A protein has these predicted regions:
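Conserved G1/Walker A P-loop phosphate-binding module
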Residues: 1-123, 264, 274-278, 338-340
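Alpha-helical scaffold elements adjacent to nucleotide-binding pockets in ATP/GTP-utilizing enzyme cores
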Residues: 51-55, 112-115, 119, 166-169, ...
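Conserved GTP-binding G-domain of TRAFAC-class P-loop NTPases and closely related GTPase folds
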Residues: 1-5, 144, 161-162, 172-341
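Generic structural motif
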Residues: 43, 89, 155, 239-241, ...
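Beta-strand-rich binding-surface signature
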Residues: 15, 22, 27, 33-37, ...
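Generic recognition of flexible, low-complexity loop/linker segments
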Residues: 25-27, 137, 222-223
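Conserved Switch II/interswitch segment of TRAFAC-class P-loop GTPases
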Residues: 12, 103-109, 117-161, 177-178, ...
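Active-site phosphate-binding and catalytic loops of NTP-dependent enzymes
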Residues: 62-65, 125-132, 209-212
Length: 341
């Protein structure tokens, strides 16, 4: 059967009103608010809590670092989630921040990534269970992780073998955004060379960082994503303290070499990271989590459930797990193929 030609565009003779649909969607979405879940992964003492507080210009989580120079670094002992409701110009954001144990801190770091990957998959599993209930909620509470901030130690050399393994495991299940922590410990030349070596390692090990390529992007979106890819990993500095520069209070740090202005692009790339996370790609991370990472997980789970049901008592004559789950499995498998998994 021949494909039908695309319909011609028609302009109504008078105003109909369906152009207000975007305003209708906006009103409903503003009333409901938005959910954003971020997980921070990295060794202890790299400023994970401080960066989150700097991004959102609010004290949201307590630092696990040292209060005094001679105090040993305090380690996060278990995966912890903290939730906040933030409002800006009438837009409400329900923010869930997940802090993780400082992986790589022990002598034996074998499979230290397992608890983190398990936590991310557990959120997918909880969402799937609610999605497949007979009387599904209209709005399912979403704890799926939308962004993983991965903190790289500013060694100036290269990624450690454990970094490569963990990045590979995480990039399979979540949107990973790598950052070079405390980049003010590097000179401008050292920072540039370090970034280039890390990019080369990403390419060599085929590590897929967010944002991803997508054939559906237009030229403007592709250009923006390329700019982001050129910056990854972001060399950042975080600070919750205000310092005075030229009579103006700014977020920054004072050290023996001088003053670091967190929002000065000549000093670090924090402003690019914040704009990327909050102003240009926030919705993209939420959609990618749902359409790629969660769909991949769901398709595998439903297929496993169906195969388990088929091999249960009675063998192949057993009934499918449920008509609804059967349909979901088919949909998930199709999307899995479309997304290249």
């Amino acid at each position: 059967m021949a494909a039908m030609p695309p319909p011609a565009t028609i302009t109504p003779a008078s105003h109909v009103g369906f152009d207000s649909i975007t305003s209708q969607i906006e009103r409903k979405q503003l009333k409901r608010g938005f959910q954003f879940n971020v997980i921070c992964v990295g060794q202890t003492g790299l400023g994970k809590s401080t960066l989150i507080n700097t991004i959102f210009a609010s004290h949201l989580i307590d630092s696990k670092g040292r209060l005094q120079p001679d105090e040993p670094v305090r380690q996060t002992t278990e995966i912890q989630g903290v939730s906040h409701l933030i409002e800006e110009n009438g837009v409400r954001l329900r923010l869930n921040i997940v802090d993780t144990p400082g992986y790589g801190d022990l002598v034996n770091n074998d499979r230290c990534w397992d608890p983190i990957v398990k936590y991310i998959k557990d959120q997918h599993s909880a969402y799937l269970r609610r999605e497949l209930t007979a009387q599904r909620e209209r709005y399912i509470p979403d704890t799926r992780i939308h962004c993983c901030l991965f903190f790289i130690q500013p060694s100036g050399h290269s990624l450690k073998p454990i970094d490569i393994v963990v990045l590979k495991k995480l990039s399979d299940v979540v949107n990973v955004v790598p950052v070079i922590a405390k980049s003010d410990t590097l000179t401008s030349e050292e920072r540039l060379q370090f970034k280039e070596r890390i990019k080369a390692e990403f390419a060599f090990h085929n590590l897929k960082m967010f944002p991803y390529d997508n054939d559906e992007y237009d030229d403007e979106e592709r250009a923006l994503n390329q700019q982001i890819k050129n910056l990854v990993p972001f060399a950042i500095v975080g600070s919750e303290k205000d310092i005075i520069i030229n009579g103006k209070a700014v977020r920054g740090r004072q050290n023996r070499w001088g003053v670091i202005n967190v929002e000065d692009e000549a000093h670090c790339e924090f402003i690019y990271l914040r704009n990327f996370l909050m102003r240009t790609h926030l919705q993209e991370m939420i959609e990618t989590t749902s359409q790629i990472h969660y769909e991949t997980f769901r398709a595998k789970q439903l297929l496993a459930l169906k195969e388990s049901s088929a091999h249960g008592p009675g063998g192949g004559a057993s009934r499918p797990i449920s008509p609804a789950a059967d349909r979901e499995m088919s949909r998930g498998s199709q999307r899995l193929g479309l997304n290249g998994y």
